[in-house]
Swiss-Prot record:
Parts forming coiled coils: none
Family assignment from sequence similarity: Belongs to the UPF0104 family.
Any one of the GO CC terms: plasma membrane
Gene source species: Methanocaldococcus jannaschii (strain ATCC 43067 / DSM 2661 / JAL-1 / JCM 10045 / NBRC 100440) (Methanococcus jannaschii)
Key words, A-Z: Cell membrane, Membrane, Transmembrane, Transmembrane helix
Localization of this protein: Cell membrane
Identification of the protein by name: UPF0104 membrane protein MJ1078
Membrane topology type: Multi-pass membrane protein
Recorded superkingdom: Archaea
Pfam family, one: LPG_synthase_TM
Broad class of where this protein is predominantly found: membrane
Entry's transmembrane regions: 32-52, 70-90, 123-143, 164-184, 198-218
């Protein structure tokens, strides 16, 4: 999370693969494959919970922009699923002469298959629970500012703004998330002073705290990694 808060394009996910290699002696490509499939499940949980919270918050008056975002979220999920199955089919049929590239692709496939069918219910439950708990952050901010908004709207606000971080344009969605959160709060007729107060507290919790404590942990982790022997698995 710390790396993703500093660099665009979700490059922090590659760093997670690097850490997996250092800690377990597994390849980076296997770690990236595991992170990729994790992101797909996260996106499924996010879009599903976003639709539920939007419907319960707005009933039949869900803003068309929100419906548009949900529609594109579903399209992205379907595209990723097709991409995964396409990769698995193609990778099982090709025979590469480059052994290093072949090892990278095989380990990536191994990472994609790390999720077993019998673990799916638990994984989906944890994803839903995780996103719901994260959504409570905004609701508690509402309470601290004496804003009379329901808990599901807090969850919806967090999910709708977090969805933009899945589009790796800026580090942690800087700029686009702020705009989205202000826009969402205006849907409930929150004035700009209240909306900006929510935004400042939200970013202090969801961004600057990660940068601060993440920097400390990054220093500790990297210092330990430098002491470990190198290996050459890809």
């Amino acid at each position: 999370m710390f790396i993703n808060s500093l660099v665009p394009a979700k490059l922090g996910d590659v760093y997670r693969g690097y850490l997996l290699k250092k800690k377990t002696n597994e390849s980076i490509s296997l770690g990236v494959g595991t992170v990729f499939i994790e992101r797909v499940f996260d996106l499924v949980a996010m879009i599903s919970l976003l639709f539920i919270s939007a419907y319960l918050s707005f009933k039949s008056d869900i803003p068309k922009e929100i419906l548009y975002s949900i529609k594109w979220g579903v399209i992205i999920i379907l595209f990723l699923i097709i991409l995964i199955f396409g990769f698995l089919i193609v990778n099982s049929k090709i025979n590469l002469k480059n052994k290093k590239l072949e090892a990278i692709l095989m380990n990536f496939e191994k990472g994609l298959k790390a999720v077993k069918l019998n673990t799916l219910p638990l994984l989906i439950t944890l994803s839903f629970t995780g996103w719901f708990i994260e959504g409570l952050t905004v609701y508690f901010i509402f309470l601290s500012l004496n804003l009379n908004l329901e808990i599901l709207f807090g969850v919806f606000s967090d999910l709708a703004s977090s969805l933009l971080t899945a589009i790796p344009l800026t580090p942690s969605g800087l700029g686009v998330v702020e705009y989205a959160l202000i826009y969402i709060l205006k849907l409930k007729n929150i004035d700009y002073s209240g909306a900006f107060a929510v935004l400042i507290l939200y970013r202090l919790i969801s961004y600057f705290s990660i940068v601060l404590f993440g920097a400390i942990m990054f220093y500790i982790v990297e210092r330990n990694i430098l002491k470990e022997p190198k290996n050459e698995k890809y």
